[in-house]
Amino acid sequence: MDNELDNLISLLQKSKASLKEKHGDRIRSIFAAHHSGSILPKEDKSLYDKCLATVDLLDEVQQMLTPPLHTLIDGFFGFINSKTLLCAVEFGIPDALSQGPKSIEQLASSSPQGELSPHRLTQVLRTLTGIGIFNYDKTSKLYSNNATSDLITTAHWSKWVYWTKFYPTEFYDMMRFLPDHIKANASRTAAQSNYNTDMEFYEYLSNSGLAKEFHRVLGAGATAQLPGMISDFPWDTLGDETVLDLGTGSGEFLFQLLENYPRMRGAFMDIPSTISRIQAECEQPGGRFSGVRDRVAGFHAGNFLDEVPASVVYTIKWCLHNWSDEDTIKILQNIRRAIVVKPEARLLIIESVLEDGRTGRPARYGDIIMMATCNGKERDIENWQAVCEQSGWEVVKSWALRNSIPSCLELRPI
């Protein structure tokens, strides 16, 4: 075993040095090459996937070699990462560093929230630099942003900064009630217990005034992940078919597809109030979606649990994880009955696919969040295949999407 570990240490040291010195700029470009609404470079996809495969393999090795107590300690104190990240954003550290490297004294004295303790701020930033958020140069004793902390500046187009302010607060409080929720006789979700209500989660958001902030956070995440969604499935193979987006929400996803694929046509379906807003954005001069109005084939107000309009191609994004398997099968059956069967016919589900490994963590986090809020869930590929087969569909491929938590499941009618 000594020789194995010596060889592994030597190999990792050499690989780390080579990647940093010879390929550092290339690695940074692979992860930085995404902008709002833009198509990602196709030539980067293979390297991106290899990076993630390497991360998963290294994570397996790390788990083998990590003392069990160290693993438990990460479980005991995982909340510290969330709360120190919240502190950094609340006190404007990423924004301050966007102007250039700074000392701890400069950061402590320039916070928009008032002067901070340099010593205590050092403790917070030591935790964050240790997990790859921010850089610290021991020689100059200066902090700087890195590719990760750049994402949480207020000026960054992705607005991931909204997530750092919402999840470590609202959802942090909610998770205190997770043990009660797991009990077989639980009558309330963790969210209902946290807010002391019997209202469903989304109903409570609307009635409490939290809905606006919640949808701002989710909307930011959706926008941030759009480049991978519109780049890593071959949408151009759909030609001039009409894509009907079910549960369209903000409408931004379909709008970006139409913007980037000029032969494509699209249609929206959601509840009446959402469709009214989207239709106005399409038809009013200067509206957000007015530039693609000539390729919008319809605005459909309704409930996909009842029925859906006929179409050759459907998309549904971040909806089915809210529903039980029984309701999901009902929705998929409605789409199967309505689809116009021809060679191009398909349903594209953009949802998380539960997987093991380091890169599977985001979906596993999402699975707990869906349970805690609305008794929903994410699904592994076997679960997806089961609900799809029971409703008349075959999952022909799961497409991995860059810089995105979900995958794109391609379904064909059977």
Swiss-Prot record:
Active site: 321
Record-listed E.C. numbers: 2.1.1.-
Cysteine pairings via disulfide bonds: none
Keywords: Methyltransferase, S-adenosyl-L-methionine, Transferase, Virulence
Gene Ontology molecular function terms on file: O-methyltransferase activity; protein dimerization activity
EC top class named in words: transferase
Binding site for S-adenosyl-L-methionine: 270
A biological process term (GO) from this entry: methylation
Coiled-coil ranges per UniProt: none
Pfam families for the chain: Dimerisation, Methyltransf_2
Record bears the keyword Methyltransferase: yes
Signal peptide: none
Biochemical pathway: Mycotoxin biosynthesis
Function, as annotated: O-methyltransferase; part of the gene cluster that mediates the biosynthesis of sirodesmin PL, an epipolythiodioxopiperazine (ETP) characterized by a disulfide bridged cyclic dipeptide and that acts as a phytotoxin which is involved in the blackleg didease of canola. SirD catalyzes the O-prenylation of L-tyrosine (L-Tyr) in the presence of dimethylallyl diphosphate (DMAPP) to yield 4-O-dimethylallyl-L-Tyr, and therefore represents probably the first pathway-specific enzyme in the biosynthesis of sirodesmin PL.
Family recorded in the similarity comment: Belongs to the class I-like SAM-binding methyltransferase superfamily. Cation-independent O-methyltransferase family. COMT subfamily.
PANTHER family: O-METHYLTRANSFERASE CICE, PUTATIVE (AFU_ORTHOLOGUE AFUA_4G14580)-RELATED
Full protein name: O-methyltransferase sirM
Organism of origin: Leptosphaeria maculans
Gene expressing this chain: sirM
